[in-house]
């Protein structure tokens, strides 16, 4: 995410950063002409003009509270999922749906598909979701753009070749049988820590996405789908006759598939009281982490699963939890007037840290007030005593990290924390000494046994689960 200057790494290397001294902002520009390069005066003037323009551009975009937060645009999977969520819930905002659909159409490539990134290659899962969302929004399947998309999807093997998350959505919309998706029973919530699979052994985003998903799987969720829109035309073989939803890629993969198949065949034997206990534990786990209007894990996939799981568990749309999950999803929307899209999350802490680091590099004393405002805003968002999943492995380490988003207390990360600490140290290490020391202690405390550092948890090296 960022190029690390070695001088800053050495400054932050002590666990408590006790010997940091005041390092006022450098008044001399850090970008100087290379004496070995041609002395092109026009080039130097253009460079200086670009730096000045970028500096002013950042200052103009700083929020009054001190932070920066830019749009976080992703691929069309997320706006497509937003449309599908509205049809799953039978809670359709037709105006918003029209704007989302227009955005999705605007991103379709000339050959008919949708990529995962700008100018990327065709992606099956993204294209299937985009096609389904457009059909739900009312696009005629015989329209030119829909025909092109459908033909390309079929050329690549059809919707059965989608990834597991897309197939889960297809199962919930009753387009494929549930045997076409991974076995995700809520009983995984009851597994002991020593078991090969445990929530602490997967990434935070996997936890927050999968836990509500186990409820959707266990109760075999069915989308309301009020217009009963289907996409059977995207399959090369009747989905009920398809036998190759899980192609074997390796011996280890084959072993996992055999274990999963055996467990699936024994699902009927799970006592109802065990299933109910597991669903309740999954419910309690994600409700505890709902995170208010900032949402579960502060990421869209987890938030939408939580919203749908609450509905499946019988929560009325006017229940406070349901209203909270809906508001969290709505906060991710970006409305551009005639079209709209949904962000995967927001990034104010990261944007503020990087913008501040860039402004520090200019050496311009005029930015000090802006940088102090940014660092003061960051101080208020440092996570110290809050509960967090990272404490499962390191319960005795004092808090001191920052999360990526406005609020995500369960999931601070080491890369945001490191960059924020460097920025504070560069600006005024005396003024921000307390925050810097807390950050350094937290980073040091989350070092893994093998010597490395991960983003969210120590010792999360269970690579076989990949």
For the regions a language model picked out, list residue spans one by one.
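Preference for long, amphipathic alpha-helical scaffolds in soluble/luminal domains
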Residues: 5-8, 12-466
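Short, low-complexity, intrinsically disordered N-terminal modules
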Residues: 1-3
């Amino acid at each position: 995410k960022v190029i690390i200057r070695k001088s800053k790494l050495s400054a932050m290397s002590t666990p408590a950063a006790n010997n940091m001294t005041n390092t006022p902002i450098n008044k001399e520009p850090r970008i100087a002409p290379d004496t070995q390069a041609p002395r092109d005066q026009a080039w130097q003037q253009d460079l200086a003009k670009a730096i000045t323009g970028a500096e002013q551009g950042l200052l103009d975009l700083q929020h009054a509270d001190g932070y920066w937060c830019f749009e976080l645009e992703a691929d069309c999977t997320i706006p497509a999922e937003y449309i599908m969520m509205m049809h799953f819930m039978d809670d359709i905002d037709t105006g918003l749906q029209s704007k989302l659909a227009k955005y999705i159409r605007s991103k379709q490539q000339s050959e008919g598909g949708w990529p995962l990134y700008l100018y990327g290659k065709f992606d099956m899962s993204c294209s299937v979701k985009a096609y389904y969302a457009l059909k739900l929004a009312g696009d005629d399947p015989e329209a030119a753009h829909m025909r092109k998309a459908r033909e390309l999807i079929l050329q690549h093997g059809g919707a059965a070749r989608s990834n597991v998350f897309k197939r889960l959505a297809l199962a919930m919309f009753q387009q494929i049988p549930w045997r076409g998706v991974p076995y995700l029973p809520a009983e995984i919530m009851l597994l002991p820590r020593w078991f090969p699979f445990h929530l602490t052994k997967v990434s935070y985003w996997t936890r927050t996405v999968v836990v509500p998903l186990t409820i959707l799987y266990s109760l075999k969720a069915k989308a309301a789908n009020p217009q009963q829109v289907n996409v059977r035309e995207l399959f090369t073989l009747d989905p009920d006759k398809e036998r190759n939803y899980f192609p074997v890629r390796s011996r280890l993969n084959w072993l996992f598939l055999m274990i999963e198949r055996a467990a699936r065949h024994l699902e009927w034997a799970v006592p109802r009281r065990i299933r109910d206990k597991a669903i309740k534990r999954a419910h309690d786990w994600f409700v505890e982490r709902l995170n208010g209007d900032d949402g579960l894990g502060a990421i869209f996939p987890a938030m939408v699963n939580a919203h749908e799981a609450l509905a499946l568990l019988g929560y009325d749309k006017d229940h406070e939890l349901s209203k909270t999950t809906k508001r969290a999803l709505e906060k991710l929307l970006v409305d551009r007037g005639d079209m709209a899209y949904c962000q995967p999350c927001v990034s104010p802490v990261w944007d503020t840290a990087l913008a501040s680091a860039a402004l520090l590099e200019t050496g311009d004393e005029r930015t000090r007030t802006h940088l102090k405002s940014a660092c003061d805003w960051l101080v208020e968002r440092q996570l110290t005593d809050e509960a967090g999943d990272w404490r499962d492995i390191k319960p005795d380490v004092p808090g001191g990290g920052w999360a990526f988003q406005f609020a995500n207390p369960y999931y601070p990360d080491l890369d945001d924390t490191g960059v924020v600490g460097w920025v504070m140290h560069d600006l005024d290490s005396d003024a921000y000494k307390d925050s810097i020391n807390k950050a350094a202690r937290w980073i040091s405390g989350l070092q893994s046994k093998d010597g490395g550092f991960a983003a969210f948890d120590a010792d999360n090296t269970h690579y076989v689960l990949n």
